[in-house]
Amino acid sequence: VIIYAFEYARRHNRRKVTLVHKANILKMSNGLFLDTGREIAKRYPDIEFEDMIVDATAMKMVIAPERFDVIVTMNLFGDILSDLAAGLIGGLGVAPAANIGDSPAPTAGAPADPPCAMFEAVHGTAPDIAGKGIANPTGLMLSSAMLLDHVSQTDAAARLRTGIMSALTSAETRTGDLGGRANTQQFTDAVIAAMR
């Protein structure tokens, strides 16, 4: 996962990788994670590397989120920090997610096929609000943009992101969870209109 973070940073022109840990307390598991991260970082001199204890990371994400670029951590801390990040940008309704493997799908033919991946909205299916027209589809749409990037359809991904940002700028087309007046379909229609 640490190598992936650096490769992701390089591929997406990111300038810094922050490794988040609790090695001061969890000396064996997190200590190994930290030591491994420091060794791997030496292979990427073009990318700034820092390590940070998880509680300090949570505070700094709230105070100065712009100081972070790529964060790599273990699952437990990742779950917590990703929900914190979602809260900073408007809630789980706007947060995309991806699970990306390190090899192509078993049925893929060409060696250049992208790694097997799954993209989803962080909030899951939200069955409690299904059919009510109050769901915010932003997270799912941004996950779709990530999927498009993943399969090298970057122009389509950029168009989708532009459409989403356009719809989010007005209370008339923003969903209620973000202080807007639009329902799910109205927001979706606004995104589509902005993409034309």
Regions found by a protein language model. Give the residues of each.
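Generic structural signal for well-ordered alpha-helical scaffold segments
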Residues: 3-7, 62, 145, 192
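Glycine-rich phosphate/nucleotide-binding loop
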Residues: 61-159, 163-172
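Short alpha-helical patches at coil-to-helix transitions and adjacent helical residues
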Residues: 30, 137-141, 184
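Class I S-adenosyl-L-methionine
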Residues: 38-42, 165, 196
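Glycine-rich phosphate/diphosphate-binding loop of Rossmann-like nucleotide-binding domains
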Residues: 1-55
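Flexible, glycine/charged-enriched surface loops at secondary-structure junctions
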Residues: 12-21, 44-52, 153-161, 170-181
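Short, amphipathic C-terminal "tail helix"
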Residues: 176-196
